[in-house]
Amino acid sequence: MSTTFKNIFKTLIFFGIGFAVLYWVFHNQQIAFEEQCMLEGTDLDNCSLWDKMLADLSSADFGWIAIVILCFMISNLSRALRWNMLLKPLGLDAKLHNTFGSIMIAYFANLTIPRSGEIIRSVMISRYEDVEIEKAMGTIVTDRIIDVLSLMIAIGLAFILSFGKMNTYFKENMDLNNTLEQILSFPALAIVPIIGLSTIYLTYRNWDKLLDTMLGEKIYKIVSGFSDGIKSIKDVENVTVFIFHSVIIWTMYYVMTYLCFFAFAPTSDLGLIAGLTVFVFGSLGIVFPSPGGMGSYHYLVGEALGFYNIGGADAFSFAMIVFISINLFCNIFFGLIFIILLPIIHKKNTLNIAGN
């Protein structure tokens, strides 16, 4: 099986997962929307969630969306500057257009195969800067670890500030005990840790023998470069600036969700805490293995908006407005721009060097 065919197959699988979840969410919301129409005495022939969603999208305030896109660019500029700070201890003074462009291309790649962006990002920076892929990947892992910690802080804040609404909503809408029993009874939860621990133990016991093989040497080189990249955080020049960029990144993410409230009439009265809650739930939805969080993002954003009495149909429209403007438009548009732009920039630089 060729690499191209494998990549196409993976892309189709992940898009299939995303569309399946999105269809499930849409189907359930359509049923709920029809029930609402019957209660209001509206003819079911004029009760299409699809038509409502298109009408909501066309009536959205794109002035607010433009500000959201600006916040998106600011967050990624800070991410690129923070990445430069991680690359510098490796002896690399990376150019901003290379790190920024690699990040935008990585977001675009994530729309095809989830989490492939991290690999693409390390490949792109190693192509345009003098750094090994393994070391670049190590810095990206550090970058993502910091993101996970930041998300955990955001989750903690949302839970504390919205505990009352969350608690009431889950009591009324979900049987948590039954859900937990189903999750805990899933066999893979027991099998996966056993396999993982066994693999670690056997690798540790046979490490010296493994290093004597060609495969072992290759693995050691990868792990060593990976480790150097991760450890670069302890040699960051200015920790205060590094933390500042981390705060900017996640503040912009939050602000993007909050400002989208004002682009859509049914959510325009929601406050800062609601923005944090919806942002956190949406972030968890994007983690799901589907392109850009397709389907899972819509479901979790809908659940979060339910805390604040936003109906399912309106919640679905809001999720689509955010998903299309950020996850699709921004990631595709800016990703394609830098796919075209970076080779042109470096071709010009090569010609200038040759001319001199």
For every predicted segment, state its role.
Residues 1-102, 169-283, 325-356:
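Predominantly cytoplasmic-facing regulatory/coupling regions of multi-pass membrane proteins
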Residues 66-74, 101, 105, 109, ...:
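Hydrophobic alpha-helical transmembrane segments of multipass integral membrane proteins
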Residues 96-101, 116-118, 131-148, 310-321:
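Membrane-interface alpha-helices at helix entry/exit sites of multi-pass transporters
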Residues 79, 83, 110-121, 147-158, ...:
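Alpha-helical transmembrane segments and their lipid-water interface positions
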Residues 154-173:
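Transmembrane alpha-helix termini and helix-breaking/packing motifs in multi-pass membrane transporters
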